[in-house]
Amino acid sequence: MSSPAQYRLEVARTLLATRMFKVERPDRSLRALRTLQRWGSNAAAAYTVSAIRCPDRIALVDERGTLTFAEIARRTDALAHGLAAAGVREGDGVAIMCRNHRGFVEATIACAKLGASQLYLNTAFAGPQIADVLRREAPTALIYDEEFADLVSGGSEGMHRFVAWSETPAERQAAGDRDAAGAGANGAGGLTDPKLEDLIAAGDPTPLEPPHEHGRVVILTSGTTGTPKGAKRKQPDSMEPLAAMFSKIPLRAHETTVIAAPMFHSWGYGHFTLAMPLASTLVLPRRFDPEGTLRAISQHRASALAVVPVMLQRIMELPPETIARYDLSCLRIIAASGSALPGELATRVMDTFGDVLYNLYGSTEVAWATIATPQDLRAAPGTAGRPPLGTVVKLLDAEGREVAAGERGRIFAANEMVFEGYTGGGGKEIVRGLMSTGDMGHFDAAGRLFVDGRDDEMIVSGGENVFPREVEDLLADHEQIEEAAVIGVPDEEFGQRLKAFVVTRADADLDEEAIKEYVKQNLARYKVPREVVFVEELPRNATGKVLKRELSAAG
C-alpha cells in the first residue's frame, strides 16, 4: 500500500496526464483558478472554468444544434435567475426527468449555481413509481420533458414545473411508438407549464455568487427489487475521484464523448462529470439507436463512447457491413457499466472495434469498485477488473473476515466518493470503513475481481449453492444463444430449481434438451436448469438490467 505522499504524487501525475491543466493563456488560467477557489469542484465551477479557458469551444451537441461553453455559462446564469424568481432557493430540491440533451445539462448547472439539490428521475419508471418518489422526496420544482407529462402528473401537485424539451411533430413521428407509455406532448400540464427556453430568454445573464452550501446529487437506485431509493451524495471536496477514473480510463482534455448511457443513471451522469473538467465536447443522443451511435462517433470524431452493456449487444447485432460503413478509427474508449458485461460480448466487441473496451463495476451507493481495462478483458473476459487509484476492495465472509484468492465472499469497497445515505433513511452495510455493494465475488490469482451475483440471488438447490451469473455466462457463450437469464423457483423436492429464460439467435436450432445437455457438459449437474423457456426478449430497465422479478411473476 502506498504512503500518503506517494498517493498524492500519483494523483497529480494522473491528472497531469489528462492535459486538463495545460496553460494556454496565463490571464485565463488565473481567472479559472480564482473561480475554483470560490466555487469548489461542482458542475457550476467546471463549466464556468471551461467558459473562461475555452469560451468558443463546442461544449454540447444535441438534436437542436451546438452550444459553446460561453453560451452555456450565459444561459445557465439566466436559467438560475429564472428559477430563483419562480421560487427555487438554495437548499431546495429540484427533480429532473429528462433524456440526454441540453435541458438536462443546463438544469443541472443552473441548480448547482443556486445551491439546489438535483434529484434525477428514471425516464423508464412507471407513473406510480414516479409519484411515490416525488411524494417521498418532495422537491420544490420539477423539470421534465414534455413527453413525460402524464407520468409526472401524479405526485407533482404544488410544485413549480418547467418543460425542458418539447418534441416537434417531426421528432414525435420519428420516435413512433417507442415511448408510448410516457404519453405525448399533450399530457397533463405539458402545454401550460413554462419552458426552460423561456426562462433563459427572459432571465438575467449576470453571473451568480456561490451559494453558502452546495446542493446534493440524488440518483435513484434501479428499483429492480421494489421502490427505488434515493442515493444522496455531496460534491467531492477534491479531484481525487477524477484521478481514480483517469488512472484506468485514459480520457483526455478537449476530446469528444458520445454519451449513449442515460444521464439520470450513475454511469451516464458519471461521464458527464468526468467531461466537465476536461472541457470535453458531449454528443447527446436523446434516444439510443445502434447505427445512429456509430454514425455520431464517426461524424463528430468522438474518442469515447459511454454505454450500458445491452447497448453494446444491440450494436453487435448490426450486420458487419453496417458497422464497416462508418470510420471509427477515432474511437479510443468504449466505457461500459450499469449491468453485467458478459465475457463473450466483451470479446466480440474488442474483436470488432479493437482493444478499447473498459468495464466499470460498482453500484449507485458505492459509485465504483473496480475497472477492467482491455488488457484485463483479453486475459479474463468475464472479469470486473481491479480497483483504481485510491480505491480499496475486500471480500468478506459472513463473519466479516477477509477471504483468500479464489474463495467467494461479499464485496465491500471504499473510495473518495461520499455516500450520505438514502434520502428516506438508512444506508448500506459498512464494515471497517468499507461499504457493501450487495454482490458476491472472488479474486483470481492475478488480483482481478469476478462478480458471481447478487448476495440475495443465490439459489440453494438440493443443498448446493448456485449463482445464476455462472449459468447465464455459459449460455451466452453458446453460438446460437443471444442472451439468457436464470432464476430460482420453488421446488418441493430440492427447495429450489433453476429455470432459464433464453433468447436464441435468428438461425438457431435449439430445443430444451440441447440446452440442458450443453450446460451439463460444462458445469456441475446441480447447475443444469430443470426448465428452459424460450422468449423473444428479456425484460430490462432503462440501464439494461434484467428485471428478474418479472420473469418470476411470469412463472
Task: Give the ranges of each region predicted by the language model.
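Conserved AMP-binding/adenylate-forming core of the ANL superfamily
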Residues: T35, W39, D56-H101, V105-I109, ...
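Conserved AMP-binding A3 loop
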Residues: T68-A70, R216-E240
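Conserved structural elements of the adenylate-forming
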Residues: A73-A78, A202, A231-A253, Q313, ...
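AMP-binding/adenylate-forming catalytic core of the ANL superfamily
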Residues: F125, D132, L142-Y144, R295-I297, ...
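Conserved pre-ATP/AMP-binding loop-to-beta segment of ANL
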Residues: P169, R178-G184, G189-L220, T227, ...
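Conserved AMP-binding/adenylation subdomain of ANL enzymes
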Residues: M239-T256, F264-A304, L318
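Gly/Ser/Thr-rich phosphate-binding loop
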Residues: P277, A302-A306, P320-A380, V392, ...
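Conserved ATP/PPi-binding loop(s) of AMP-dependent carboxylate-activating enzymes
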Residues: R386-G390, E399-R432, E464-V466
